[in-house]
Amino acid sequence: MDSIKSKLRSIIRSHFLSVAGLIKRPSPYVYILNGHMVDWHHDNDSDGERFAKQLADLHKYCDFVNFEDAVRMIIKHESVKRCTVAFTFDDGWRDCYTQIAPQLEKYGVNAMFFINPNFADAADNNDVAYMENFTVNTTKSPGKHPITWDQMKDLQKRGFLFGAHTLDHYCIADNNIKELEHQIGDCRKVMEEKLGVPCEFFAFPYGRLEHANPAPIEIACKHYKYVFSQSDHKHFSHSAEE
């Protein structure tokens, strides 16, 4: 009996969400969506099919644009007639290369990938201890693998963009100015040295402003033209010069 009730609740919930989805559609604004990976605990390339379905469902209600175009639209307060979406992904996982990028290319758009350079270095140097600590302890994603610099360079040639995310996915909610300068400022230097292009974009690890404080925010704004968090998403701040 409990099993039947559970199934009925599931069916009712499914139908309710379907009807609610028909009533409520995304508002005609520009959205920059943030993700991390296709699957949290492994790198099964078949998961690209699931991401493809998610994109197909989203595309019914939203236009997809390149990341840099979305940034321009937001800064210039450009109006849009339909929900408009660009994509970012944090941490630099291998499925950014094997699954995410190939699916986005089918829609003719890129993404911004925010990278932790020391994680990518660990892949190139086969530093198993660092990769295990990063995946198990830092990001709670055991079984995942980093994107390599060669893969990033290939994606860069295909129009994808790369930003900074601190060297080690460092939680910047402290006042250790020396370490903050190292993690935030030196991250830009490494990104530019490895990829050969200016690195103007930075995203806070862990995503929200409570994971930062005035000191790291000031340092980030000193080193980067654009600084992203997941907080206060309805209020965009930019300089009067933009």
Regions found by a protein language model. Name each.
Residues 88-89, 163:
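Generic enzyme active-site microenvironment
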Residues 124-125, 173-175:
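A short secondary-structure junction signal
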Residues 93-94, 168:
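Short, glycine/acidic-enriched loop or turn micro-motifs at the edges of active sites
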Residues 2-12, 17, 101, 105-167, ...:
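Active-site-adjacent pocket scaffolds in enzyme catalytic domains
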